[in-house]
Amino acid sequence: MSKQLQDAYIVAASRTPIGKAPRGAFKNTRPDELLVHAIKSAIAQVPEFDTKLIEDAIVGCAIPEAEQGLNVARMGALLAGLPNTVGGVTVNRFCASGITALAMAADRIRVGESDALLAAGVESMSMVPMMGNKPSMSPHIFDRSEDFGIAYGMGLTAERVAEQWKVSREDQDTFSVESHRKAIAAQQAGEFKDEIAPYAIVERFPNLATGEIDTKTREIALDEGPRAETSLEGLAKLKTVFANKGSVTAGNSSQTSDGSGALLVVSEKVLKQFNLTPLARFVSFAVRGVPPEIMGIGPKEAIPAALKAAGLKQDDIDWIELNEAFAAQSLAVIRDLGLDPSKINPLGGAIALGHPLGATGAIRAATVVHGLRRRNLKYGMVTMCVGTGMGAAGIIERL
């Protein structure tokens, strides 16, 4: 027996600042501690809400092992002081893990299975390297030529996209400079203050005079990545990293990062029960596969699918958070779909702000939720390419 789907409302959205990896502010901060901070700061936005109603914590993590293993979702929920009745599940769709967690939470509420869920993402690229501590790829990927692309490094896939979509080195560098410019301007204007919960880190250093270890507390309130001095001339001097005659460099690629984001998603029943003000509604989500060797073009397929599911047109979207894994793939997607550049990453993207893999979707969702309200816009989208050849896109409506 079918029943009408109900709406899934986002009532809280918060994140940590994004730290540079592996030598940034969070180099000694465990990922579960970052997750705890994001969860606590999100819950603090709705003090009238009873956390006993949360049924599950769904947390995205791209490399869920070592310090972010042992089901980091459950660990984070417990360490954040949530009731032990709150479950926890860690989900992995590489770079789209965080937005997948949010979509899963929204789906369970829409079909009436749950009334309150926590959706989050976390990643420490300082403590857990991008491929994990002991990567082991199936040898069978070399059995068929169609599967060879699975073995490509992400940078090499970006080179393939740049070549196939004819994205020049100069265009990539120009795009990257603009990412930093927008991020610096946004920081100076206080655009991130609604979404970022400042994080206090304790630094320890030897006191040579006393022979003891001194401590100093430092508050991190802004993302570490943006550089005001970034210039086209400076980026042009960088050597290519992944191909001898390529165009992809460290300067026009996303930064490795540490961070976490969390959102509270509830049903209309809970809204009314606690008289909560909804920040946004999660509208639709889509994932589509593409050849692994050109994984960066994934959003080209996912964006139209998410729009169709929402009954919207491309022009209806006011704010697009397109994860800047690489300038090459971002520009290829923008040009292929004819996206309006003025709507893309208005506060800067991953090239400047950083890309903590599994946390990115949740972090960028928090950016969209608060950004739409601050600028009085209607629809926002979070979209990204995904390693092994996928694209993901989620649409959010301001209420």
Predicted region positions:
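Active-site-proximal alpha-helical scaffold in enzymes
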Residues: V91-E123, A162-F192, A262-K269, I334, ...
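Conserved beta-ketoacyl condensing-enzyme motif
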Residues: F26-L117, V122-H140, I196-I220, E293-I294, ...
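Conserved N-terminal phosphate-binding loop of PLP-dependent enzymes in the Aspartate aminotransferase
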Residues: S2, L70, G121-E123, M130, ...
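Condensing-enzyme catalytic core mediating Claisen C-C bond formation in acyl metabolism
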Residues: S2-P31, T230-I297, E301, K308, ...
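Short, well-ordered amphipathic alpha-helical segments that serve as non-catalytic structural scaffolds
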Residues: P31-P47, V72-G76, A101, G155-V161, ...
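N-terminal extracellular/periplasmic Venus flytrap/periplasmic-binding protein-like
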Residues: R15-P17, N28, H37, E48, ...
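Conserved catalytic cysteine-centered active-site region
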Residues: T29, C61-D115, G149-L156, A228-Q255, ...
